[in-house]
Amino acid sequence: MTQSALHTEFGGIAALRDALARRQVSAVELAQSGLDAAQAASGLNAFLHIDPDLTLAQARAADAALAAGTAGPLAGIPIAHKDAFVTRGWRTTAGSKMLAGYASPFDATVVERLAEAGAVSLGKLNCDEFAMGSGNENSAYGPVRNPWDTQAVPGGSSGGSAAAVAARLVAAATGTDTGGSVRQPAALCGVSGIKPTYGTVSRYGIIAFGSSLDQAGPLAPSSRDLLELLDVMTGFDPRDATSLQACDGQANESGRVRRGHDAAQAGYDAAGSQPLKGLRIGVPQEYFGAGLAPDVAAAVEAALAQFEQLGAVRVPVSLPRTELAIPAYYVIAPAEASSNLARYDGVRYGHRAAQYGDLNEMISRSRAEGFGDEVKRRILIGTYVLSHGYYDAYYLQAQRLRRLIAQDFQRAFAGQCDVIMGPVSPTVAKNIGDNRDDPTADWLADVYTLGVSLAGLPAMSVPCGFGGQDGRRPVGLQIIGNYFDEGRLLALADRYQQVTDWHQRAPVSQDA
């Protein structure tokens, strides 16, 4: 049995900020409590790197800023970062032996912005190797265990982030979502998580997997907490070539333009102040087919019924290419991974084999030793579909299909519905090792999240119940919006969380 961290006694981020301002608790006390809780819950394997000296130094700086009246909006809030974000002073491995011992000389933009806001990092969180996986079993440093049932996976690839939030070791965590890697672990661990519109949160300093798909997003117990984080994380970044410049707001001294308050916050305020009467919730028939487990279907149906009680209207919509998102994604994402991971050759950086003959053997052995099986599998797929003889037949066809998938969503939003809702995952969390002999089974777990990623839309996961044989494995509701509609999604989630308590429930024990 492990103790919860001290921050849980004060509620969400807003309440915690108020407690810090009133000196009811100090940032150092919160940080030390979080470190103690993380150590006690080490059996979850959620954390990869912890440095108490760095954490407590940040906490002391937050306390000083609070005392001086110069504190940022997240001053003293204990968080942690997925190990896919580079961090100055902390090791960054992306869950891979290839980057064992790597220390970045700079911070990712997301890390930098959260630090500027005063957040205190407790460490780096476990993840699937190079963010490739749906169960956090592909980490070179061992699987993460789900706090609700330690025999179960937490989801992936941001499994360490979801597990740490679910176990209440931190108030919030960062994650990345390429094909569902924030939403899926959030659902399986019973926490809230959001993937923003592609390009609204900087990718600078995220170790790349699929550059046209990767997007950073936060995980936290509630949608209100997510808004607090997204308000800081969102904004144009000239260091990221994919960062969107269509932002409102004033440039700060570093030249960056923040759009969080003017966009996500404004959308949240506008949607939150309006009654739900007449809100059209699109329910895709393709999300409720034979592959959806009955316990997941029941929990999602109950959530939809709750929204109807709040005044929303349920309307059927069709996303006919839902299942085709799987082959499209597993052509495009591996192709981009093959290109992005080509740099890890042991020459300039990355693991280098101890024994080799010529240069070619050194590169071959270094990559064979440094990469895990799933990463190798995707590199091979990507290299194949980008080869001269198959580029048109596979890669270009997948890109055409990607456009058609995006058009399906736009047809739904154009005149049929305001938001789309459905399950995040077709099942509750599987047991660790269940899919070891069939790695493609994990690919199918993302059938409801991949289309959103290919289209670049915002979507989030909200806890909506439990399933499984023992009834203690969480289920998540997916809420999908049109481009830049994060504020509305968060407001709708908040309305739901005002009348339900799924997001307030935490696992009693994190014994492994």
From Swiss-Prot:
Q: Which reaction does it catalyse?
A: L-glutamyl-tRNA(Gln) + L-glutamine + ATP + H2O = L-glutaminyl-tRNA(Gln) + L-glutamate + ADP + phosphate + H(+)
Q: Tell me the GO BP annotations in alphabetical order.
A: translation
The record's PROSITE patterns line, in alphabetical order, gives:
AMIDASES
- According to its UniProt record, which residues of this chain constitute the active site? 82, 157, 181
| Pfam families cross-referenced by the UniProt entry | Amidase
Q: Which GO cellular component term is one of those annotated? A: glutamyl-tRNA(Gln) amidotransferase complex
Molecular function terms from GO: ATP binding; glutaminyl-tRNA synthase (glutamine-hydrolyzing) activity
Bridged cysteine pairs (disulfide): none
Supply the alphabetized keyword list: ATP-binding, Ligase, Nucleotide-binding, Protein biosynthesis
Q: EC annotation?
A: 6.3.5.7
Task: Tell me the domain of life.
Answer: Bacteria
Q: Which NCBIfam families match?
A: gatA
Function of the protein = Allows the formation of correctly charged Gln-tRNA(Gln) through the transamidation of misacylated Glu-tRNA(Gln) in organisms which lack glutaminyl-tRNA synthetase. The reaction takes place in the presence of glutamine and ATP through an activated gamma-phospho-Glu-tRNA(Gln).
**What does the similarity note say?**
Belongs to the amidase family. GatA subfamily.
Q: How does it assemble?
A: Heterotrimer of A, B and C subunits.
What name goes with this protein? Answer: Glutamyl-tRNA(Gln) amidotransferase subunit A
